[in-house]
Curated annotation (Swiss-Prot):
It is found in: Cytoplasm; Nucleus. GO terms for molecular function: SH3 domain binding. It comes from the Eukaryota. Pfam families: Securin. This is Securin. Residues 36-55 are annotated as: Disordered.
Length: 202
């Protein structure tokens, strides 16, 4: 058994026990308990007790014990449940993806008239290049003056003329003569304006 040491409240000396006044008035009698055939005298103790079991009732200890056990079990069971939940969530995600893949052909069956429409490509309507048969990018057009076509000739005849060669030169149809001086070219651009009328009163 564990040894009990009593400390008096007033002087703090061990081994000295003083009965309180309230206990004397009530006529408290030491109670005798029989345990294992032995008689033990239990007297009311005053002061602090060291190395003694707590004075809580057994029901309270059991309740606290069951609460502690329940929390420990819940903590232990929470770990595997989280792992199971993650496995279930991954399974659900894979099932959803499989269902989504299987549902894609069903959408084509529900709308078969979409395939009957003409395909629309906006780049086809924004292409301003000439066809390959009428490309003029290969012609050396640097330094060429303004060209005026005869009314009898058509555009296709001009486009079918190949690049200029020194042996076969097509007839040049220029607006001005290449041998003219710049002053003569400027004189052709002069336009006669009507005479200024100064007689009008403003």
């Amino acid at each position: 058994m564990s040894t009990l040491i009593y400390v008096d409240k007033e002087n703090g000396e061990p081994g000295i026990h003083v009965a309180p006044k309230d206990g004397l008035k009530l006529g408290s009698v030491p109670s005798v308990k029989a345990l294992d055939g032995r008689s033990q005298v239990s007297t009311p103790h005053v002061g602090k007790m060291f190395d003694a079991p707590p004075a809580l009732p057994k029901t309270a200890r059991k309740a606290l014990g069951t609460v502690n056990r329940a929390t420990e079990k819940s903590v232990k069971t929470n770990g595997p449940l989280k792992q199971k939940q993650t496995t279930f969530s991954t399974k659900k995600i894979t099932e959803k993806t499989v269902k989504a893949k299987s549902s894609v052909p069903a959408s084509d069956d529900t709308y078969p008239e979409i395939e009957k429409f003409f395909p629309f490509n906006p780049l086809d309507f924004e292409n301003f290049d000439l066809p390959e048969e009428h490309q003029i990018a290969r012609l050396p057009l640097s330094g060429v003056p303004l060209m005026i076509l005869d009314e009898e000739r058509e555009l296709e005849q001009l486009l079918h003329v190949g690049p200029p060669s020194p042996l076969k030169m097509p007839p040049l149809l220029w607006e001005s003569n290449l041998l003219q001086s710049p002053s003569s070219i400027l004189s052709t651009l002069d336009v006669e304006l009507p005479p200024v009328c100064c007689d009008l009163d403003i």
